[in-house]
Amino acid sequence: METDLNSQDRKDLDKFIKFFALKTVQVIVQARLGEKICTRSSSSPTGSDWFNLAIKDIPEVTHEAKKALAGQLPAVGRSMCVEISLKTSEGDSMELEIWCLEMNEKCDKEIKVSYTVYNRLSLLLKSLLAITRVTPAYRLSRKQGHEYVILYRIYFGEVQLSGLGEGFQTVRVGTVGTPVGTITLSCAYRINLAFMSTRQFERTPPIMGIIIDHFVDRPYPSSSPMHPCNYRTAGEDTGVIYPSVEDSQEVCTTSFSTSPPSQLSSSRLSYQPAALGVGSADLAYPVVFAAGLNATHLHQLMVPGKEGGVPLAPNQPVHGTQADQERLATCTPSDGTHCAATPSSSEDTETVSNSSEGRASPHDVLETIFVRKVGAFVNKPINQVTLTSLDIPFAMFAPKNLELEDTDPMVNPPDSPETESPLQGSLHSDGSSGGSSGNTHDDFVMIDFKPAFSKDDILPMDLGTFYREFQNPPQLSSLSIDIGAQSMAEDLDSLPEKLAVHEKNVREFDAFVETLQ
């Protein structure tokens, strides 16, 4: 499609659409995990804050989404679909909903890619967060357990709505116009859940030990494209190695970014700090297993001691019980290897010997590990970020100085120098200037401070006391009922005397009136 976009705008638009597609998959799948997701706001975010949302990526979901996209982007005639289905322990399955991200030919050539498209994609992603929690599949996902699980499938191509049955409903999440077409995000969901009415799906403890997804297809088999939304237990052994976090965040390296990505940390998936072991030929990093996570899915190795360290996947997967025990082995004081028990500084973690097989130096490896990918609109300086790793579409968002937060003058301003005030000379007393006592307390004159609202007997008077006193002033004596009645009675009693005085001096009063005419 012929457009007037320059190469930079076209590159940014492709990045925005690709990253929006990946975030869309993350939002949909995380909404079907069966648990509430709570993220805390931050005034100075340090994670991947694309579209101004704290959506922490699950590496498995990102891997599946990138594999489904296969380098393509949603365009006219090519739609990205996320299918959510249900599968019971008896083997019955039913499609619940299909989310579709597509693009039509209606273009908006006047719109600006730099900010307008980005902000509208952010609003569309926020709308998706709300819509994913109002469809019937959300309530079913909250009740999944031993009886059934929720699966997801990502495919690229024509939308397949035949599995939803008759009478399904559709909802359009929103649209965003771009210079190359209009992005549309919609959902078709099943409303007939008669298949579910014959059973009671409750979270009851099993009579005997049952693997939660024993009847569910394994995550990446060649025969089935379905994947469970929830995490697998530690007893599974599929031999799957997911790409490193850095690889999963490859799409985040657009020009917007100035902050590293953050990964999912929840009750089911979490990384814990571990000691760093150093071998003679390889980098030996002990694997930390998280509760509820597949042991084989933790082939990602964790480099501790660096805040925001990136897990590194080994070159070759290790299988078998012996290999698992080797990965679980921890360093003890009796071992011959060097262990950083309390890695508190970067120097401890970088004490790694060179490989005897001619591999890359450990310094290069660590430098590769800690090159951080960054999110959007965050100008927090990070010492690991280099200018060569920043591909920013807006030059104004490039970090001015690559320095630590501790030395950032905006975070920790330097102490102001002690300079002599220009008013100090005018406050010097004449007696102290000629003396040689040198006492600093004699260099100033005591000023008698008398504010306008203060009184002589209460000095100084508090401003609050002054305000309260004049806010509720005493009542005027003339307005008092008792005093008014008393004065009226006195006037009536003295009225005859006043009339007698007037009659006596009536001629003088008449003469005065004539002078006024």
UniProtKB/Swiss-Prot annotation:
LIR (motif): residue ranges: 444-447
Residues with Phosphoserine modification: 355-356, 361
Post-translational modification as stated in the protein's UniProt record: Phosphorylated by ULK1, ULK2 and mTOR. Phosphorylation status depends on nutrient-rich conditions; dephosphorylated during starvation or following treatment with rapamycin. ULK1-mediated phosphorylation of ATG13 at Ser-355 is required for efficient clearance of depolarized mitochondria.
Descriptive protein name: Autophagy-related protein 13
Sites of N-acetylmethionine modification: 1
Coiled-coil residue windows: none
Taxonomic lineage of the native organism: Eukaryota, Metazoa, Chordata, Craniata, Vertebrata
InterPro entries recorded: ATG13 (IPR040182), HORMA_dom_sf (IPR036570)
Subunit structure: Part of a complex consisting of ATG13, ULK1 and RB1CC1. Interacts with ATG101. Interacts with ULK1 (via C-terminus). Interacts with ULK2 (via C-terminus). Interacts (via the LIR motif) with GABARAP, GABARAPL, GABARAPL2, and LC3A. Interacts with TAB2 and TAB3. Interacts with C9orf72.
Family from the record: Belongs to the ATG13 family. Metazoan subfamily.
Compartment(s) where it occurs, according to its Swiss-Prot or TrEMBL record: Cytoplasm, Cytosol; Preautophagosomal structure
Keyword presence, Phosphoprotein: yes
Domain notes: The LIR motif (LC3-interacting region) is required for the interaction with the ATG8 family proteins GABARAP, GABARAPL, GABARAPL2, and LC3A.
UniProt function note: Autophagy factor required for autophagosome formation and mitophagy. Target of the TOR kinase signaling pathway that regulates autophagy through the control of the phosphorylation status of ATG13 and ULK1, and the regulation of the ATG13-ULK1-RB1CC1 complex. Through its regulation of ULK1 activity, plays a role in the regulation of the kinase activity of mTORC1 and cell proliferation.
GO biological process assignments: autophagosome assembly; mitophagy; piecemeal microautophagy of the nucleus; protein localization to phagophore assembly site
